[in-house]
UniProtKB/Swiss-Prot annotation:
Catalytic activity: 3-oxoadipate + NAD(+) = maleylacetate + NADH + H(+); 3-oxoadipate + NADP(+) = maleylacetate + NADPH + H(+)
Position of the signal peptide: none
Protein's recorded name: Maleylacetate reductase
Gene3D superfamilies in the record: 3.40.50.1970, Dehydroquinate synthase-like - alpha domain
Top-rank EC class of the record's enzyme: oxidoreductase
Gene behind this protein: clcE
Keyword field: Aromatic hydrocarbons catabolism, NAD, Oxidoreductase
Species name: Pseudomonas aeruginosa
Family statement: Belongs to the iron-containing alcohol dehydrogenase family.
Keyword NAD applies: yes
Gene Ontology terms, MF aspect: alcohol dehydrogenase (NAD+) activity; maleylacetate reductase activity; metal ion binding
């Protein structure tokens, strides 16, 4: 056994009523002029969360949107500078926390993240920005939040359809972490536990969307899954999803949900150890099929065409995904990749 374990993580405050720690976290970081970021839809929630620290808020910006368009990032950075903010509070999911990361990258302001979905961006140093129809991603320690507050009550109002796809998005992070070249034994344990917890939570949330225990379990699973992907390199699944999102503007979590079973099936024969872990975590002999059925049986999309993709986009997306070579357990073959995309487009069950 050979590995190098270099674990990076924000400070995590977890559990019901954990939001009460927000004032102390701001004080600990020396933030007394915060820029509060949200999406337009979550602006009221953002003001509610910020109310106890309103005296330490310099400005609000509610323009966060999917895939962090460059113009939105420029506007948020401008407000950060003109308001003389000395920190960022990001209240929301991947869109909001992703925007906070670009602000941090360009201004070096510390981030306090308050996630309201299971996307997991808050646990990683991965950032992305979209310009000219191309999503560019990277890693930088400056964009990792300094503190993350996981308050399950903030996810109770998350619509069920978004809850399920966001949770499967979290699972995708851990799945790729299992066969990453820089995976370690501890990350494998975290991935297995994170996937199992999230799968259990999905079925319970689907039956009872306001089950606080299920919501907490989903956040717990999301934390573990995101902690894995934040410490490993990413492969085919994430590359395809970033290409589909940045090029076609497909919704982030839904795209991950559709693509994951097919990307795993593509790599399955090349990653026997990962498949053994997944059989345990998913409680199923065929992990790609288990993930497909998890989405289908809990009301999530299983076809890219239902997300707005056109069939004529398949070859373009495949070629873009092949442009920049990246580590993947199985060699990337154009014909096999296009077959994967066709299956995902039509919503067929995954095939090797």
């Amino acid at each position: 056994m050979n590995f190098i374990h270099d674990y990076r993580s924000p400070r995590v405050i977890f559990g019901p009523d954990s939001l009460a720690r927000l004032p102390q976290e701001l004080e600990r970081l020396g933030i007394d002029r915060a820029l509060v970021l949200t999406t337009p839809e979550q602006a009221p929630l953002g003001r509610q969360v910020a109310e106890p620290v309103i005296g330490h808020v310099a400005a609000f910006y509610d323009g966060a949107t999917m895939h962090v368009p460059a113009l939105v990032a420029e506007e948020a950075c401008k407000i950060a500078r003109t308001s003389e903010a000395n920190g960022v509070i990001a209240i929301g999911g991947g869109s909001t926390i992703g925007l906070a990361k670009i602000v941090a990258l360009r201004t070096e302001l510390p981030i306090v993240a308050v996630p309201t979905t299971y996307a997991g961006s808050e646990m990683t140093s991965i950032f992305g920005i979209t310009e000219g129809g191309v999503k560019k991603t990277g890693r930088d320690a400056r964009v990792m939040p300094r503190a993350v507050i996981y308050e399950p009550r903030l996810t109770l109002e998350l619509p069920l359809s978004i809850s399920v796809t966001s949770a499967i998005n979290a699972i995708a992070h851990a799945v790729e972490g299992l066969y990453a070249p820089d995976a370690t034994p501890l990350l494998t344990i975290m991935a297995q536990e994170g996937i199992a917890a999230t799968v259990r939570a999905i079925s319970r949330m689907y039956q009872s969307p306001r089950d606080l225990q299920a919501r907490g379990d989903a956040l717990y699973g999301a934390w573990l899954c995101a902690s894995v992907v934040g410490n490993v390199s990413m492969a085919l699944h994430h590359k395809l999803c970033h290409t589909l999102g940045g090029t076609l503007d497909l919704p982030h979590a839904q795209t991950h949900t559709v693509v994951l079973p097919h990307a795993l099936a593509y790599n399955a024969r090349a990653v026997p150890d990962a498949m053994r872990v997944l059989r345990i975590a998913l409680g199923h002999d065929d992990p790609p099929t288990a993930l497909y059925e998890l989405a289908r049986d809990n009301g999530a999309p299983v076809a890219l065409r239902d997300l707005g993709m056109r069939e004529e986009d398949i070859e373009h997306v495949g070629d873009l995904a092949l442009q920049d070579r990246y580590p993947n357990p199985r060699e990337l073959d154009r014909d096999a990749l296009l077959a994967l995309l066709r299956d995902a487009y039509h919503g067929r069950p995954p095939s090797a």
